[in-house]
Structure formats: C-alpha cells, structure tokens
Curated annotation (Swiss-Prot):
SMART domains: KISc. It is found in: Cytoplasm, Cytoskeleton. Keywords: ATP-binding, Coiled coil, Cytoplasm, Cytoskeleton, Microtubule, Motor protein, Nucleotide-binding. Residues 7-330 form the Kinesin motor domain. Its main location: cytoplasm. This is Kinesin heavy chain. Signal peptide: none annotated. The gene is kin. It comes from Neurospora crassa (strain ATCC 24698 / 74-OR23-1A / CBS 708.71 / DSM 1257 / FGSC 987). ATP binds at residues 88-95, 238-245. Residues 343-866 form a coiled coil.
C-alpha cells in the first residue's frame, strides 16, 4: 500500500455582483494578477492571495471542473478517498458551483453532476476485467442533526467510528446505482427534501450542510485484488451576518447553528495548521466529525472558496480568502484503500517465512557470540556476526497492479488509524493500545447510540410538544373563533332582543293607541248616542215646537180671521168695503148726472151719500192705521231677530258651560251670566213694555187726528152741498179710481202686516209669560238658594262620579296593560327558553363536531407517530427502496455491464413513501 503526503487543493472563485450589491453602491475590489493570484483592495485590508487556481467572474462551470475536480475523480478510481467542498458566505454561489442551475443543463450544471458523469464514463472506458459497484448516499446536517435526505424520517442519525470502517454515519441509507440517470434521480429526491429558506441575501438560501457520498468499489476478477474509494461532495451552508440577511425566528436559529458549525470547522483548521495544538477538536461539530478523514487524514481534498467581488461584502470576502489560505497549509496523508489477492498474500507469507528463518539464524549467531563474550573470552573481529543485510521493504504489489479497488469494508492494514500521530497532525499525544482503542471506540459508539436515541426521544418529545402547541394554538384559534362567533351571535341576539323589545314596545304602544282609540271610539259612540238622544229630544221638541207653532198658527189664523173679518173679499177682487166705496162713488156719479140734467137731488140720497163717505173715511183711517202698524211690525221683526240671535248665543254659551267641568269660578261666572241675562231680559221686557205703551199713545193720538179729519170732512160736506159734489164729481171719480188701486195694494200689504202683528202679539204674550216667570223666580229667594244648594250638591256628586269613573277607567286600562305586559313577558320567556334550547342544541352539535375533529386529529397524530416509528425501527418503513436499492449492481469496464444490471432503478419511486409536508425545496433540482 502506498502513502503520500499532500496539501489540500484550494480553488477560489468569484461571482459577478448581484442586484443587491449594485443597488447598495458596491464596487469591485478584486483584481486578478494571474491564474493563481488575486489582490483585494478594501477598507479593512489590502493584500494578495495565492491559491492553486483563481477563477474570475467570467469563468464557466466546465473550467472549475476540468482544473479542480477531474483529477479527484481519477484519484477515487485509483482507490483514494476524496473530498470536494465549497465554502463561503451566504449568497456567494456555493450551491451554484456544486449543483448548478439544472442537472439536465449541459452548460449550467455544477460540479457534482459532472463528477457523476465522469465516474460512469471512466468506469465504462476501463478494462473489462475490472468489476465496479457504485453506492450513493445523501444526508444533510440541519440544526446539528444528521438527516437522511433519502429517508427523511431518519432525522437524527449518530456518528460512529470503527477500526475497520473508520468514521461513518450509522443508519444512513446507501443505494446501489448503475447509471447517471439513477444518480440524478437520487439527487433530485434528496434535493427536494433539503431545507432552504429566503433571506435578504439569497432567495433560496441553504439552511443546512449537505453531503453527497459516492462509494466506488472495484475488483479485478482475474487476480482478485480490490480497491475502494469514497468521495464526499459537501455543499456547506454559507456563513451569515444577521444584519445583512435579516434572519429572524426559525431562520435566525438556523443561522446560529450554521455559524457555530463553520466556526468549529475553522477551529479544526487552526488546530491542524498552527503546529502547537496537541488536540484537534473534531468532535465539537458533527460536520468536522464526518469530515475528520478529509481534514488532515486519509483523503485528497479540494476546497472551493466562493467569494463576492463587491465592496458591499468586503469583510466576508477577506474572511473567506483567509480561511482558504489557512486550509491550504493542511497536510493530508492519502492512502490507497486496497485489499490483497490470495497470490499476493502467499507471496507475502513466503517472504515473511524467509525473513523469520533469517532472523532465527541471526539470533542464534548473536546468542553464541554473546555467550562467548559473557564467558570472558574475546571473539576475534573477523568472527563477529555481521549486521543483518536483509532489507525489510513493504510489498509494492498493490501499487503495481492495474487500478485495483477496495471493498466497502476495509481491512485493518488498509487504512490509517485516526488517532495515530504519524498519520495525522493534531491527534492525541498519548497513544492508546490496540485493545484500549477498540474498547474506546466501542464505548464511544455506544454513547453515540445512546445520545442519538435520547436525541430522537427528545426530538419526538419536542415534535409532540410542537404538535401539541400547534394543536393548542389551533384549539385556541378555534376557541377564539368560537368566542368571536359566540360574541357575534350574542351581539346579534342582543340586537334581535332589542328589536324584539322595540317591536314589543311598539306593539304595546300600538295596543295602547288602539285602546285609546277604542276609548275614544266608545266616547264618540256615547257622544253619538247622546247626539242621537238629543236628536230624538230635538225631534220631540220639534214635534212639541211644531205643535206650539201649530197652536201659534192657529191663534194667528184666528186673530187674522178676526182682524180680516171686515176685509173679507170672499174670493172676489173687491171686498165689501171696496164695494161700499164703489157704490158710494156710483151713487155720487148718479147724483152728478141728475144735477147736470138740471134735476133736483133728493135729500135722502145726499144723506145716504154722507153716510157712505163717513164709512169711507173709516176705511181710509183703517188703511192708514194698517200702514202704520206695518211699519211698526217691521221694527218689531228686526228686534225679534236680534233677540233670537242673543238667545241662540246664550244657548251656545250655556252648552259650552255644560260641556266642560265647572269649577267654583265657573259657577260664579255662570251665576253672573244668568243674573246678567235675567237683568238684560228684564230690561228688554221693560223697554218693550214702554215701547208698546208709547205705541199705544201714538195710536191714540193718530186716532184723535183721524177723528179730527173726519169731522173736518163732514163739515166740508155739509158746507159744500150738492154743488161742490157736482163740480168735483169727475175729480172724486178719479180719486176713487186711484183709491181703488191704492186699496188693492194696501189690502195685499195689509194681510202681511196683519200676520206680522199677530206674530208680534204672540211673541209679546210669550215674552210676558217669561217675564212673569222671571219675576216669580226672582221673588222666590229661598227657592233659589235651595236650587243653588241642590245644584252644588249635584255638581259635587257629578264631579265625584266623574272622578270615580275616570279612576275606574284608568284602573281598567292599567289592569289591561298589566295583563298584556304579563302575556308579553310570558311569551318572551317562552321565546327565550326556545332560543336557549336551540343554542344548547347548536352548542352540543358544535362540541360533538369539535370532539370528532379532535379525535380525527389525534388518530392522524397517532398514525403519523406509528408510521415514523416504523420507518425508524424497521426496514419495512423504507418500502421497496430498501429491497431493490440494496441489491448490488456490478458494472464492467470496456463498455459492457454485467448481466442482470439494469439501466434504471425501479425502486427509487418508493424511496419516500410519505414525503414530508411543508418542506422547502431547492432551486437546483428541476423535476423533469
């Protein structure tokens, strides 16, 4: 087995400035002086950095691979262990360098896809007598917990170290692959399960360190020799400055763990390079523990440091370059992991036996010489035993065979032990015995298993606690929603109650209004009945009045008959008086004719004519009296109309007084009004009596005047004689004609005036009767006092009766309102009871529904717990993946595959039967 000391290959790559740096005013601060040197000119420091190779912003993915990684693939196929990992701040392009934009993009794919393709290309182009098997595994270190990305349910795997296997992850799923596409499928599956998140520096920032492990075993089928090489492809999470990334919450916790593990990596590199440390802290972080062989051990390591050229990230760029400079000074001791063939073992055995025989002969010669010397004798110099000239050199058969390969389980002699001082710098200063070391490793593995078990239990408890908290939060949210819904329902119920109460109040008001209207209707009905009764009374009084009027008409007719007895026309145009006047005129004409004929007028005729003239004078006087009485009757009619108007006004005032409640002041006012009306009526009656007396005196004077006129006419007749009569015959005739016309008009008016006179006489009789009654009532003071006392008692009784009626009606109304309120309250109680029953039923339904949902959630939780426990405890949790993926798929060189090997992996689809939900996916893997 060959061993060679080599340094870590460090390659620096600078990406172009991104949008954030340009918007922040960043300027390029890096200049490239050659293919391996760059100069940084920043505010903090200036200087040049030299690495194995420096790539500027315009480099391609293929340039990185051809210079940096392609030799590493050849070393893996030659039986060496190899490591390629990218280091740098977040957003510096590590994942882009390792994975690229897409696996299927020939130009944009990164280092890992190109390595896979190069491996299978080299296998197919190798010799036909070499048989290869390729295994891959994919894991991430998230929050200092190792998680299998191909079996995400295994999220807390322990790190073990054994003498034969070295450092490895226990329980990590390894999949046999036979083609590039199968490896790509595994990478896609694992990449989808990887944790990523968005920060201010990167939209899809890796929140974990991912490690993709490729193990290649090769065997020479002719000689039986074997080699194995293991390649670690590490995509480190970027170091973060919280002020720039804006991390908070879970992202901040992830950043803390990332920076802690990167700090542990820096401490390991410092311990390996300072030359003073007696202890290398590999166990401070699971990342450094897994990469223990890659840092100062049995591995050929390539470090790609990714940097930003902008002044915005100058501090991070300087830190990354200094990290690369320190890592470059680490010395690894890579060895070929070889397994010897039987022929080589026989050859080594023969050589060992020859050496043993030589040693035994040499020992015998030395012992005999020593005995001589001890016996006090001297051995001649020429008889001294010569020094052993046999050169003990290790066999070089392993290095001379054509590309041998080691199996997965290495022999103790095939690898350097981890703590050996000669193999790695910084191992413990006190070496352990072989047995002590094995016991130490065994004890360490047990403790690691216990720690992993306890961490799994703690993680399960934390997960259960988190789920319980989430469930509690969900329940609280549900409770808050129910509370809000309850408050909303309560508010709606209160609104409905207010509306109901408002409607009830409006209903009560409407009912009270209806009751008031009913009362008003009853009052109006009573008033209507009273009005009807009054109408009946008025009809009765009208009948009585009509009877009185009939009696008055009868009296009027009788008086008219008496008054017009002397003027009865008996249906003709002229009455008896008119005919008498006409006869007198005719007789006067006859006498005029006799006198004109010259005949003597008989004295009897003159006497008869004189009597008729006297009678005619009476008629004239009567006509004048009738005319005067007509004028006086007009005045009396006007006065009567005024009296009737005053009487009607008094009656209206009396009705108004009766229609309202009378107080003592009202009573006094009524008494005053009655006294005033009586006094006014008495004054009117007295005035009327005086006027009638004056009329009588006037009539007497007129009668005397008429008598004087009659006497004068008589004298004139006597003095004039027949000559006068004959001279004035024609004039008298004309006067008689005029008198006849006037008489007709006077007779027409006479009848009307007689009617008025009769009416006035009747009214005068009634007034006299009323006046007499007033006089009688005014004279009876005792009776008036008694009537006043009775009226007061009647008024008091009426008032008390009215108050009692009002109180009774008010009490009836209050009783009716109270009954309605009681009925409304009972109805409201019944409605509230029904609403309470409905709400209780709804609450019971909601509780039942919630219990069903809670039971379903608990069932799903138990099922998830049972499924995760089955996935961790048995291989059945891996599905068909654990069966097909663990079947070796040997590959032959020369472009031919071993019979039975397939180009596809049908068990990949069953790798993750229950893919985790809400996992952040990587932008490097585009599902095809």
């Amino acid at each position: 087995m060959s061993s060679s000391a080599n340094s870590i290959k460090v390659v620096a790559r600078f990406r172009p400035q991104n949008r954030v740096e340009i918007e922040s005013g960043g300027q390029p601060i890096v200049t490239f002086q050659g293919p391996d040197t760059c100069t940084v000119d920043s505010k903090e420091a200036q200087g040049s950095f030299t690495f194995d190779r420096v790539f500027d912003m315009s480099c391609k993915q293929s340039d990185i691979f051809d210079f940096s990684i392609k030799p590493t693939v050849d070393d893996i196929l030659n039986g060496y262990n190899g490591t390629v990992f990218a280091y740098g701040q977040t957003g510096a392009g590590k994942s882009y360098t390792m994975m690229g934009t897409s696996i299927d993009d020939p130009d944009g794919r990164g280092v890992i896809p190109r390595i896979v393709e190069q491996i299978f290309t080299s296998i197919l182009s190798s010799a036909a007598n070499i048989e290869y098997t390729v295994r891959v595994s994919y894991m991430e270190i998230y929050m200092e917990r190792i998680r299998d990305l191909l079996a995400p349910q295994n999220d807390n795997l322990p790190v073990h170290e054994e003498k034969n296997r070295g450092v490895y992850v226990k329980g990590l799923l390894e999949i046999y692959v036979s083609s590039v596409q199968e490896v790509y499928e595994v990478m896609r599956r694992g990449g989808n399960a990887r944790a990523v998140a968005a920060t201010n520096m990167n939209q899809e920032s890796s929140r974990s360190h991912s490690i993709f492990v490729i193990t290649i075993t090769q065997k020479n089928v002719e000689t039986g020799s074997a080699k194995s090489g293991q390649l670690f492809l590490v995509d480190l999470a970027g170091s973060e400055k919280v002020g720039k990334t804006g991390a908070s919450g879970q992202t901040l916790e992830e950043a803390k763990k990332i920076n802690k593990s990167l700090s542990a990596l820096g401490m390991v590199i410092n311990a390996l390079t300072d030359g003073k440390s007696s202890h290398v802290p590999y166990r401070d972080s699971k990342l450094t523990r897994i990469l223990q062989e890659s840092l100062g051990g049995n591995s050929r390591t390539t470090l790609i440091i990714n940097c930003s050229p902008s002044s915005y990230n100058d501090a991070e760029t300087l830190s990354t370059l200094r990290f690369g400079m320190r890592a470059k000074s680490i010395k690894n001791k890579a060895k070929v992991n070889a397994e010897l063939s039987p022929a080589e073992l026989k050859q080594m055995l023969a050589k060992a036996k020859t050496q043993i025989t030589s040693f035994e002969n040499y020992i015998v010669n030395l012992e005999s010489e020593v005995q001589v010397w001890r016996g006090g004798e001297t051995v001649p110099k020429e008889k001294w035993v010569p020094p052993l000239e046999l050169a003990i050199t290790p066999s070089k058969s392993a290095s001379t065979t054509a590309r041998p390969s080691t199996p997965s389980r290495l022999l103790p002699e095939s690898r350097a032990e981890t703590p050996a001082i000669s193999d790695r710098a910084g191992t413990p200063s006190l070496p352990l015995d072989k047995d002590e070391r094995e016991e130490f490793l065994r004890r360490e593995n047990e403790l690691q298993d216990q720690i992993a078990e306890k961490e799994s239990i703690a993680a399960a408890a934390e997960r259960q606690l988190r789920e319980t908290k989430e469930e509690l939060i969900a329940l609280k949210d549900h409770d808050s929603k129910l509370g809000k819904e309850n408050e909303r329902l309560i508010s709606e119920s209160n609104e409905f109650k207010m509306q109901l109460e408002r409607l009830a109040f409006e209903n009560k008001e409407a009912q009270i209004t209806i009751d008031g209207l009913k009362d008003a209707n009853s009052e109006l009905t009573a008033e209507l009945d009273e009005v009807k009764q009054q109408m009946l009374d008025m009809k009765m009084s009208a009948k009585e009045t009509s009877a009185v009027l009939d009696e008055k008409e009868k009296k009027k007719a009788e008086k008219m008959a008496k008054m017009m007895a002397g003027f009865d026309l008996s249906g003709d145009v002229f009455s008896d008086n008119e005919r008498a006047v006409a006869d007198a005129i005719a007789q006067l004409d006859a006498l005029f004719e006799i006198s004109s004929a010259g005949d003597a007028i008989p004295p009897e005729d003159i006497k008869a004519l004189r009597e008729k003239l006297v009678e005619t004078q009476g008629f004239v006087r009567q006509a004048e009296l009738s005319s005067f009485s007509a004028a006086s009757s007009d005045a009396e009619a006007r006065k009567r109309a005024e009296l009737e108007a005053r009487l009607e006004a008094l009656q209206q005032e009396h009705e108004e007084l009766l229609s309202r409640n009378l107080t003592e002041a009202d009573k006094e006012e009524v008494k005053a009004l009655l006294a005033k009306s009586l006094s006014d009526k008495s004054a009117v009656q007295v005035e009327l009596v005086e006027q009638l007396k004056a009329d009588i005196a006037l009539k007497n004077s007129e009668t005397e005047h008429l008598k004087a006129l009659v006497d004068d006419l008589q004298r004139r007749v006597k003095a004039g004689g027949a000559g006068v009569a004959m001279a004035n015959g024609k004039t008298v005739q004309q006067q008689l004609a005029e008198f006849d016309v006037m008489k007709k008009s006077l007779m027409r008016d006479l009848q009307n005036r007689c009617e008025r006179v009769v009416e006035l006489e009747i009214s005068l009789d009634e007034t006299r009767e009323q006046y007499n009654n007033v006089l009688r009532s005014s004279n009876n003071r005792a009776q008036q006092k008694k009537m006043a006392f009775l009226e007061r008692n009647l008024e008091q009784l009426t008032q008390v009766q009215r108050q009692l009626v009002e109180q009774n009606s008010a009490l009836k109304k209050e009783v009716a309102i109270a009954e309605r309120k009681l009925m409304a309250r009972n109805e409201r109680i019944q409605s509230l009871e029904s609403l309470l029953q409905e709400s209780q039923e709804k609450m019971a339904q909601a509780n039942h529904k919630f219990e069903v949902q809670l039971a379903a959630v608990k069932d799903r939780l138990e099922a998830a717990k049972a499924g995760s426990t089955r996935g961790l405890g048995t291989d059945a949790g891996l599905g068909g993946f654990s069966i097909g993926s663990r079947i070796a798929k040997p590959l032959r060189g020369g472009g031919d595959a071993v019979a039975g090997a397939t180009a596809t992996n049908p068990t990949i689809a069953t790798l993750q039967q229950n893919p985790p939900e809400n996992k952040r996916s990587s932008w490097f893997f585009q599902k095809s």
